[in-house]
């Protein structure tokens, strides 16, 4: 979801309704969004459900290197539950790395979208 659509949804489509975007999958569960504040310019920022899942944003060409805050990279997920461990799984998404905030004191992701190198082949949707 783009910041432009987020603004449209909040101000025009769903005026007066609380809009709660989510990001997730079967491995991670649902990442919650950071409550909207004006300085975020309608960017949607998600924080994973720690300690179950940890998201990192890594250099697509060097997936062992985490990018700096604000830089774009590929989303890498680590999941750990009593029944399951999936370390460092490269997702089909890219995003900007977002610093921790008061509500979520761990890294998040901003402006999640399909990984651009897969753009022609990625099928989007709700599964």
Regions found by a protein language model. Give the residues of each.
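Active-site glycine/GP-rich loop and adjacent strand/helix microenvironment
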Residues: 1-127
